[in-house]
Amino acid sequence: MILSGKTISEKLTEKELEITPLTEEQIQPASVDLRLGPHFVTIDDSKEAVISFERPIRYREWTTSDETIVLPPHTFLLATTMETVKLPNHLTAFVEGRSSVGRLGLFIQNAGWVDPGFNGQITLELFNANRLPIELPIGRRICQLVFAEVTGEVAPYQGKYLFQKGATMSEIYKDAF
């Protein structure tokens, strides 16, 4: 069952669910809006001839103190949320792009699942589908988390992205076959 904004607020008040920092305006009727953080990562294409699942990829990462970042046309970028999210073992969340943002041609995430027990910042996969650059304001609401109850017993998330801070690079090379 999808949680209502009222239920989300109650779980936040009871510290059953934690999202920090958070303002009341971010809580929506059935979701929580998350804001764009200042940390970014992109594949360093000057050092990579091909992207492989079998080895680490070299990335370029930076944190900006600017108020905006410009995403060039047809460009992929990893970003992070300002907020840190801590889910209990009985809740899961879906990361969804905000409709108003998507209508500008900015695609947000293609791996939008947050497992029960996750604790960390959310890495966002951003893609500018336009022929024009998009100026992204740091601190602007960019995506939303939709929460759902998980039935039955579940082991908390213990994966490689637990406690991630900032935009986090792919670690698919660590996966077992």
Swiss-Prot record:
CDD domains: trimeric_dUTPase. Keywords: Hydrolase, Magnesium, Nucleotide metabolism, Nucleotide-binding. Its cofactor is Mg(2+). It is an enzyme of class 3 (hydrolase). Homotrimer. Bifunctional enzyme that catalyzes both the deamination of dCTP to dUTP and the hydrolysis of dUTP to dUMP without releasing the toxic dUTP intermediate. This is dCTP deaminase, dUMP-forming.
